[in-house]
Protein backbone atom coordinates (compact mmCIF):
# COMPACT_ATOMS: atom_id res chain seq x y z
CA UNK A 1 0.00 0.00 0.00
CA UNK A 2 2.89 2.37 0.69
CA UNK A 3 4.34 1.66 -2.74
CA UNK A 4 1.04 2.57 -4.38
CA UNK A 5 0.83 5.83 -2.43
CA UNK A 6 4.37 6.78 -3.38
CA UNK A 7 3.76 6.04 -7.06
CA UNK A 8 0.50 7.98 -6.99
CA UNK A 9 2.20 10.96 -5.36
CA UNK A 10 4.95 10.98 -8.00
CA UNK A 11 2.39 10.78 -10.81
CA UNK A 12 0.40 13.70 -9.39
CA UNK A 13 3.55 15.82 -9.03
CA UNK A 14 4.50 15.05 -12.63
CA UNK A 15 1.00 16.08 -13.73
CA UNK A 16 1.38 19.37 -11.84
CA UNK A 17 4.62 19.93 -13.72
CA UNK A 18 2.83 19.48 -17.05
CA UNK A 19 0.15 21.96 -15.97
CA UNK A 20 2.81 24.51 -14.99
CA UNK A 21 4.43 24.21 -18.42
CA UNK A 22 1.08 24.69 -20.10
CA UNK A 23 0.32 27.79 -18.04
CA UNK A 24 3.61 29.43 -19.02
CA UNK A 25 3.74 31.22 -22.35
CA UNK A 26 6.58 29.21 -23.87
CA UNK A 27 7.03 27.60 -27.26
CA UNK A 28 8.96 24.57 -25.97
CA UNK A 29 6.64 21.81 -27.19
CA UNK A 30 9.26 19.09 -26.81
CA UNK A 31 9.60 19.59 -23.06
CA UNK A 32 5.81 19.54 -22.73
CA UNK A 33 5.61 16.23 -24.60
CA UNK A 34 8.42 14.75 -22.49
CA UNK A 35 6.74 15.78 -19.24
CA UNK A 36 3.42 14.48 -20.49
CA UNK A 37 4.85 11.08 -21.39
CA UNK A 38 6.57 10.86 -18.02
CA UNK A 39 3.30 11.62 -16.22
CA UNK A 40 1.48 9.02 -18.29
CA UNK A 41 4.13 6.40 -17.48
CA UNK A 42 3.82 7.14 -13.77
CA UNK A 43 0.05 6.79 -13.90
CA UNK A 44 0.51 3.50 -15.73
CA UNK A 45 2.68 2.29 -12.87
CA UNK A 46 -0.01 3.25 -10.37
CA UNK A 47 -2.58 1.37 -12.45
CA UNK A 48 -0.37 -1.72 -12.66
CA UNK A 49 0.19 -1.70 -8.90
CA UNK A 50 -3.54 -1.46 -8.25
CA UNK A 51 -4.40 -4.21 -10.72
CA UNK A 52 -1.79 -6.64 -9.39
CA UNK A 53 -3.33 -9.92 -8.32
CA UNK A 54 -6.51 -9.48 -10.37
CA UNK A 55 -5.41 -11.93 -13.07
CA UNK A 56 -3.69 -11.74 -16.41
CA UNK A 57 -6.89 -11.02 -18.29
CA UNK A 58 -7.78 -8.06 -16.09
CA UNK A 59 -4.27 -6.58 -16.31
CA UNK A 60 -4.21 -6.96 -20.10
CA UNK A 61 -7.55 -5.21 -20.40
CA UNK A 62 -6.44 -2.32 -18.18
CA UNK A 63 -3.20 -1.93 -20.12
CA UNK A 64 -5.10 -1.73 -23.41
CA UNK A 65 -7.44 0.89 -21.98
CA UNK A 66 -4.51 2.90 -20.60
CA UNK A 67 -2.80 2.78 -23.98
CA UNK A 68 -5.89 4.09 -25.73
CA UNK A 69 -6.33 6.73 -23.05
CA UNK A 70 -2.72 7.90 -23.30
CA UNK A 71 -2.87 8.10 -27.10
CA UNK A 72 -5.95 10.30 -26.98
CA UNK A 73 -5.11 12.12 -23.74
CA UNK A 74 -3.37 15.13 -25.24
CA UNK A 75 -4.42 15.63 -28.86
CA UNK A 76 -2.65 18.18 -31.02
CA UNK A 77 -5.56 20.61 -31.20
CA UNK A 78 -5.31 21.03 -27.43
CA UNK A 79 -2.05 22.92 -27.81
CA UNK A 80 -2.71 24.71 -31.10
CA UNK A 81 -5.27 27.46 -30.94
CA UNK A 82 -5.03 28.37 -34.62
CA UNK A 83 -2.28 26.89 -36.80
CA UNK A 84 -0.58 29.47 -38.99
CA UNK A 85 0.38 27.17 -41.83
CA UNK A 86 -1.95 25.29 -44.12
CA UNK A 87 -2.04 21.60 -44.82
CA UNK A 88 0.09 22.00 -47.93
CA UNK A 89 2.95 23.77 -46.13
CA UNK A 90 2.74 21.96 -42.82
CA UNK A 91 6.38 20.90 -42.88
CA UNK A 92 7.80 24.44 -42.94
CA UNK A 93 5.58 26.12 -40.43
CA UNK A 94 6.11 26.75 -36.75
CA UNK A 95 3.05 26.09 -34.57
CA UNK A 96 2.07 28.91 -32.24
CA UNK A 97 0.98 27.72 -28.81
CA UNK A 98 -1.78 29.62 -27.13
CA UNK A 99 -2.55 28.71 -23.55
CA UNK A 100 -6.12 27.83 -22.62
CA UNK A 101 -7.60 28.44 -19.20
CA UNK A 102 -8.17 25.25 -17.22
CA UNK A 103 -11.77 24.38 -16.42
CA UNK A 104 -12.72 22.48 -13.29
CA UNK A 105 -15.65 20.19 -13.94
CA UNK A 106 -17.75 19.47 -10.82
CA UNK A 107 -18.07 15.85 -9.81
CA UNK A 108 -21.37 14.32 -10.77
CA UNK A 109 -22.98 11.00 -11.51
CA UNK A 110 -21.33 8.96 -14.25
CA UNK A 111 -22.80 9.58 -17.69
CA UNK A 112 -25.23 7.06 -18.97
CA UNK A 113 -24.04 4.71 -21.66
CA UNK A 114 -25.88 5.53 -24.85
CA UNK A 115 -26.19 2.72 -27.34
CA UNK A 116 -27.03 3.17 -30.93
CA UNK A 117 -29.56 1.01 -32.72
CA UNK A 118 -26.73 -0.45 -34.80
CA UNK A 119 -25.06 -1.72 -31.62
CA UNK A 120 -28.13 -3.74 -30.63
CA UNK A 121 -28.24 -7.31 -31.75
CA UNK A 122 -31.83 -7.21 -32.85
CA UNK A 123 -34.58 -4.72 -32.18
CA UNK A 124 -37.06 -7.43 -31.37
CA UNK A 125 -34.63 -9.33 -29.12
CA UNK A 126 -32.31 -6.83 -27.42
CA UNK A 127 -32.71 -3.07 -27.47
CA UNK A 128 -31.11 -0.90 -24.77
CA UNK A 129 -33.45 2.06 -24.51
CA UNK A 130 -35.15 3.82 -21.61
CA UNK A 131 -38.38 2.08 -20.64
CA UNK A 132 -41.35 3.47 -22.45
CA UNK A 133 -44.85 3.92 -21.10
CA UNK A 134 -46.29 1.43 -23.54
CA UNK A 135 -47.42 -1.84 -22.09
CA UNK A 136 -45.93 -5.17 -23.02
CA UNK A 137 -47.54 -7.10 -25.81
CA UNK A 138 -50.44 -8.85 -24.11
CA UNK A 139 -50.81 -11.60 -26.70
CA UNK A 140 -49.27 -14.46 -24.66
CA UNK A 141 -51.29 -13.50 -21.59
CA UNK A 142 -54.45 -13.22 -23.65
CA UNK A 143 -53.86 -16.68 -25.06
CA UNK A 144 -53.40 -18.21 -21.61
CA UNK A 145 -56.32 -16.27 -20.20
CA UNK A 146 -58.67 -17.30 -22.99
CA UNK A 147 -57.52 -20.91 -22.63
CA UNK A 148 -58.28 -20.83 -18.92
CA UNK A 149 -61.63 -19.22 -19.58
CA UNK A 150 -62.41 -21.95 -22.09
CA UNK A 151 -61.62 -24.60 -19.49
CA UNK A 152 -63.32 -23.02 -16.48
CA UNK A 153 -66.44 -21.80 -18.25
CA UNK A 154 -67.61 -25.33 -18.83
CA UNK A 155 -68.19 -26.24 -15.18
CA UNK A 156 -69.52 -23.29 -13.22
CA UNK A 157 -72.28 -25.29 -11.54
CA UNK A 158 -70.10 -27.66 -9.55
CA UNK A 159 -68.42 -31.03 -9.55
CA UNK A 160 -69.93 -34.25 -10.80
CA UNK A 161 -68.21 -37.55 -10.04
CA UNK A 162 -69.18 -40.65 -11.99
CA UNK A 163 -68.03 -44.13 -11.10
CA UNK A 164 -69.35 -46.28 -13.91
CA UNK A 165 -67.46 -49.25 -15.26
CA UNK A 166 -69.69 -50.18 -18.21
CA UNK A 167 -73.02 -49.41 -19.80
CA UNK A 168 -75.88 -50.62 -17.65
CA UNK A 169 -73.86 -50.83 -14.44
CA UNK A 170 -74.91 -48.87 -11.42
CA UNK A 171 -73.11 -45.53 -11.07
CA UNK A 172 -72.48 -43.13 -8.22
CA UNK A 173 -72.61 -39.49 -9.26
CA UNK A 174 -72.75 -36.97 -6.39
CA UNK A 175 -72.99 -33.37 -7.55
CA UNK A 176 -71.59 -30.48 -5.51
CA UNK A 177 -73.18 -27.18 -6.53
CA UNK A 178 -71.45 -24.64 -4.30
CA UNK A 179 -70.87 -22.05 -7.00
CA UNK A 180 -67.15 -22.69 -7.22
CA UNK A 181 -65.50 -23.09 -10.59
CA UNK A 182 -63.88 -26.37 -11.43
CA UNK A 183 -62.40 -27.62 -14.67
CA UNK A 184 -63.50 -31.20 -13.86
CA UNK A 185 -67.18 -31.84 -14.27
CA UNK A 186 -67.28 -35.61 -14.50
CA UNK A 187 -64.73 -38.19 -13.41
CA UNK A 188 -65.25 -41.77 -14.52
CA UNK A 189 -63.41 -44.91 -13.51
CA UNK A 190 -62.30 -45.73 -17.06
CA UNK A 191 -59.67 -43.00 -16.88
CA UNK A 192 -61.49 -40.21 -18.72
CA UNK A 193 -62.74 -36.83 -17.58
CA UNK A 194 -65.92 -35.62 -19.26
CA UNK A 195 -67.44 -32.16 -18.94
CA UNK A 196 -70.96 -30.96 -19.65
CA UNK A 197 -70.46 -30.31 -23.36
CA UNK A 198 -69.34 -33.95 -23.93
CA UNK A 199 -65.69 -33.08 -24.52
CA UNK A 200 -63.39 -35.55 -22.81
CA UNK A 201 -59.72 -36.17 -22.28
CA UNK A 202 -57.94 -39.20 -20.83
CA UNK A 203 -55.80 -39.17 -17.74
CA UNK A 204 -52.20 -40.25 -18.32
CA UNK A 205 -51.00 -43.38 -16.56
CA UNK A 206 -54.37 -45.04 -15.97
CA UNK A 207 -54.90 -48.54 -17.45
CA UNK A 208 -57.41 -48.69 -20.26
CA UNK A 209 -58.84 -51.55 -22.26
CA UNK A 210 -61.62 -54.06 -22.39
CA UNK A 211 -60.04 -56.33 -19.77
CA UNK A 212 -59.94 -53.57 -17.16
CA UNK A 213 -63.52 -52.52 -17.89
CA UNK A 214 -64.81 -56.10 -17.79
CA UNK A 215 -63.06 -56.78 -14.48
CA UNK A 216 -64.45 -53.59 -13.00
CA UNK A 217 -67.96 -54.40 -14.25
CA UNK A 218 -67.78 -57.80 -12.57
CA UNK A 219 -66.67 -56.20 -9.30
CA UNK A 220 -69.30 -53.46 -9.33
CA UNK A 221 -72.12 -55.89 -10.14
CA UNK A 222 -72.33 -56.78 -6.45
CA UNK A 223 -74.93 -54.80 -4.54
CA UNK A 224 -74.71 -53.50 -1.01
CA UNK A 225 -76.70 -56.44 0.44
CA UNK A 226 -73.72 -58.80 0.00
CA UNK A 227 -75.58 -60.72 -2.71
CA UNK A 228 -73.88 -61.05 -6.06
CA UNK A 229 -76.01 -60.22 -9.10
CA UNK A 230 -74.53 -62.95 -11.29
CA UNK A 231 -75.29 -66.67 -10.92
CA UNK A 232 -71.62 -67.62 -11.08
CA UNK A 233 -69.13 -67.47 -8.23
CA UNK A 234 -69.04 -64.10 -6.46
CA UNK A 235 -65.95 -62.02 -7.19
CA UNK A 236 -66.44 -59.68 -4.24
CA UNK A 237 -63.54 -59.27 -1.87
CA UNK A 238 -64.01 -60.85 1.54
CA UNK A 239 -62.52 -57.80 3.24
CA UNK A 240 -65.31 -55.59 1.94
CA UNK A 241 -68.04 -57.74 3.47
CA UNK A 242 -69.49 -56.08 6.50
CA UNK A 243 -69.02 -58.03 9.73
CA UNK A 244 -71.45 -57.71 12.60
CA UNK A 245 -69.63 -56.52 15.71
CA UNK A 246 -70.93 -56.23 19.23
CA UNK A 247 -69.01 -55.50 22.42
CA UNK A 248 -69.85 -56.42 25.99
CA UNK A 249 -68.12 -55.76 29.28
CA UNK A 250 -67.75 -58.69 31.67
CA UNK A 251 -65.87 -59.06 34.98
CA UNK A 252 -62.43 -60.66 34.82
CA UNK A 253 -61.84 -64.06 36.39
CA UNK A 254 -58.25 -63.39 37.47
CA UNK A 255 -55.31 -61.16 36.72
CA UNK A 256 -53.99 -63.60 34.12
CA UNK A 257 -54.31 -62.60 30.51
CA UNK A 258 -55.30 -66.10 29.34
CA UNK A 259 -58.23 -66.38 31.77
CA UNK A 260 -61.39 -65.20 30.02
CA UNK A 261 -65.00 -65.77 31.08
CA UNK A 262 -66.63 -68.78 29.36
CA UNK A 263 -69.72 -68.61 27.16
CA UNK A 264 -71.86 -71.03 25.13
CA UNK A 265 -69.16 -71.62 22.49
CA UNK A 266 -65.67 -73.07 22.50
CA UNK A 267 -62.86 -70.68 21.52
CA UNK A 268 -59.25 -71.12 20.55
CA UNK A 269 -56.68 -68.36 20.85
CA UNK A 270 -54.72 -67.67 17.66
CA UNK A 271 -52.83 -64.48 18.50
CA UNK A 272 -52.49 -61.31 20.51
CA UNK A 273 -51.55 -57.71 19.81
CA UNK A 274 -50.31 -54.88 22.07
CA UNK A 275 -52.60 -51.92 22.61
CA UNK A 276 -51.31 -48.37 22.51
CA UNK A 277 -51.74 -46.72 25.89
CA UNK A 278 -52.51 -49.95 27.74
CA UNK A 279 -50.11 -52.38 29.43
CA UNK A 280 -52.40 -55.32 28.66
CA UNK A 281 -52.44 -56.87 25.16
CA UNK A 282 -55.52 -57.80 23.18
CA UNK A 283 -56.17 -61.52 22.63
CA UNK A 284 -57.75 -62.86 19.44
CA UNK A 285 -59.91 -66.01 19.46
CA UNK A 286 -61.73 -68.07 16.82
CA UNK A 287 -64.65 -70.43 17.31
CA UNK A 288 -63.50 -74.03 17.69
CA UNK A 289 -66.91 -75.61 18.20
CA UNK A 290 -67.29 -76.44 14.50
CA UNK A 291 -64.47 -76.46 12.02
CA UNK A 292 -64.66 -73.60 9.55
CA UNK A 293 -66.86 -71.34 11.68
CA UNK A 294 -66.23 -67.68 10.71
CA UNK A 295 -67.03 -66.28 14.15
CA UNK A 296 -64.23 -64.42 15.92
CA UNK A 297 -63.80 -62.48 19.13
CA UNK A 298 -61.08 -60.44 20.81
CA UNK A 299 -60.70 -59.78 24.49
CA UNK A 300 -58.92 -56.82 26.08
CA UNK A 301 -58.74 -55.44 29.61
CA UNK A 302 -60.50 -52.16 30.26
CA UNK A 303 -58.11 -49.29 30.92
CA UNK A 304 -60.42 -47.43 33.27
CA UNK A 305 -61.47 -50.56 35.21
CA UNK A 306 -58.77 -53.21 35.30
CA UNK A 307 -61.19 -55.69 36.88
CA UNK A 308 -63.40 -55.66 33.76
CA UNK A 309 -62.84 -57.20 30.32
CA UNK A 310 -64.15 -55.88 27.00
CA UNK A 311 -65.20 -58.75 24.72
CA UNK A 312 -65.94 -57.89 21.09
CA UNK A 313 -67.67 -60.50 18.90
CA UNK A 314 -67.21 -60.35 15.13
CA UNK A 315 -69.13 -62.38 12.58
CA UNK A 316 -71.89 -64.92 13.02
CA UNK A 317 -71.73 -68.62 13.81
CA UNK A 318 -72.79 -71.02 11.07
CA UNK A 319 -73.94 -73.64 13.57
CA UNK A 320 -76.17 -73.98 16.59
CA UNK A 321 -75.06 -73.19 20.12
CA UNK A 322 -73.04 -75.81 21.96
CA UNK A 323 -72.98 -75.47 25.69
CA UNK A 324 -69.58 -76.09 27.21
CA UNK A 325 -68.45 -75.95 30.75
CA UNK A 326 -65.19 -74.24 29.97
CA UNK A 327 -63.39 -72.79 26.97
CA UNK A 328 -60.40 -74.35 25.31
CA UNK A 329 -57.31 -72.19 25.13
CA UNK A 330 -53.86 -72.67 23.73
Curated annotation (Swiss-Prot):
It holds the Pfam family WRKY. GO terms for molecular function: calmodulin binding; DNA-binding transcription factor activity; sequence-specific DNA binding. Its main location: nucleus. It is found in: Nucleus. Keywords: DNA-binding, Nucleus, Transcription, Transcription regulation. PROSITE patterns: WRKY (PS50811). GO terms for cellular component: nucleus. The keyword DNA-binding applies. This is Probable WRKY transcription factor 74. It comes from Arabidopsis thaliana.
